[in-house]
């Protein structure tokens, strides 16, 4: 291998003056070097000592990371931009390969992050179920102990009521533990509920009302007070008639009608005042006659009417 490397170096050294290699071999290559093209991906080889062989890579003591001492050459084209003009030949051993493709993550593999929550939820559910089962077991144990105490107390009470003759004294009975509460009554079956329809309910209610009415009718009735609404209900149909009193006219004296006119009242007052004088004069002369004011028929004036209106000075239009 060392001889081949020496031959390659000699060939490169000899051909450096004539420039019959690389980009100076033809016009096409010269034009291509002047074009701003991106370089193709290249393969880099790392040289290791031949004595160590493949065991050098697998040895735990040796460094597996490449260093500058292990690299034979460094490709400087990666750091250069695409606009670099390649005027000189690249040094080193170069092999053209395909472009490097980024590694894709395989989605078919199960992800640990998605599996962990499901396992945690299953463990939580299992813990809750175990706790419920343990609570039920403790309740069953308590009920069994209570039942055993009740049975034992009943047996002891039976033995104390009928003691054997000449036998040992019976120990005092233990205080009985209160029995557990009775279970709730069973719910009626749906078939019974369906048969008990609304028609039956109506019939039962009517029967109850009829029984109540019969009980009320059989009970002694109290004297009820007359209702005024019933008394006054037919008052509009009653017709009234005038009744004259049959009394003798001789026994009853007609009352003098008092005058309502002011002039008549004054004349009546004067007549009463000077009645004794008129009597004396009439006895002496016998010819004097008192002319009393004639009673004019009194006309009642209405309270409201045209007499209350004030005159405006206009003529009445006929």
From Swiss-Prot:
GO annotation terms (biological process): aerobic respiration; mitochondrial fission; mitochondrion organization
Biased composition (Low complexity): 154-164
Coiled-coil annotated residue ranges, if any: 124-157
Domain of life: Eukaryota
Region (Disordered): 101-121, 154-193
The entry's keywords: Coiled coil, Mitochondrion, Transit peptide
Role noted for this protein: May play a role in mitochondrial aerobic respiration. May also regulate mitochondrial organization and fission.
Name the UniProt record assigns to this protein: Mitochondrial fission regulator 1
Originating organism: Danio rerio
Lineage: Eukaryota, Metazoa, Chordata, Craniata, Vertebrata
């Amino acid at each position: 291998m060392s001889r081949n490397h020496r031959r390659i170096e000699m060939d490169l050294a000899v051909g450096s003056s004539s420039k019959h290699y690389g980009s100076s071999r033809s016009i096409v290559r010269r034009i291509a070097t002047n074009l701003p093209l991106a370089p193709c991906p290249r393969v880099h080889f790392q040289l290791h000592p031949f004595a160590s062989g493949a065991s050098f890579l697998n040895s735990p003591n040796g460094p597996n990371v490449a260093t500058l001492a292990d690299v034979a050459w460094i490709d400087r084209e990666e750091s250069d931009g695409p606009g670099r003009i390649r005027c000189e030949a690249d040094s080193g051993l170069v092999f053209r390969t395909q472009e490097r493709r980024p590694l894709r993550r395989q989605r078919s593999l199960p992800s640990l992050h998605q599996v962990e929550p499901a396992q945690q939820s299953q463990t939580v559910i299992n813990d809750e179920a175990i706790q419920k089962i343990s609570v039920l077991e403790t309740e069953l144990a308590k009920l069994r102990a209570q039942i055993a105490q009740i049975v034992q107390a009943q047996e002891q009470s039976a033995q104390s009521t009928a003691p054997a003759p000449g036998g040992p004294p019976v120990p005092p009975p233990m205080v009985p533990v209160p029995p557990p509460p009775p279970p709730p009554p069973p719910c009626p079956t749906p078939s019974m509920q369906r048969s008990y329809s609304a028609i039956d309910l109506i019939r039962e209610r009517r029967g109850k009302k009829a029984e109540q009415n019969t009980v009320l009718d059989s009970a002694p009735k109290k004297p009820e007070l007359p209702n005024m609404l019933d008394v006054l209900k037919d008052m509009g149909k009653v017709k009234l008639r005038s009744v004259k009193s049959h009394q003798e006219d001789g026994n009853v004296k007609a009352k003098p009608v008092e005058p309502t006119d002011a002039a008549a009242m004054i004349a009546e007052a004067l007549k009463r005042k000077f009645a004794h004088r008129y009597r004396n004069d009439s006895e002496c002369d016998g010819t004097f006659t008192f002319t009393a004011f004639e009673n004019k028929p009194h006309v009642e004036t209405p309270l409201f009417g045209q007499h209350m209106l004030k005159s405006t000075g206009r003529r009445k239009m006929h």
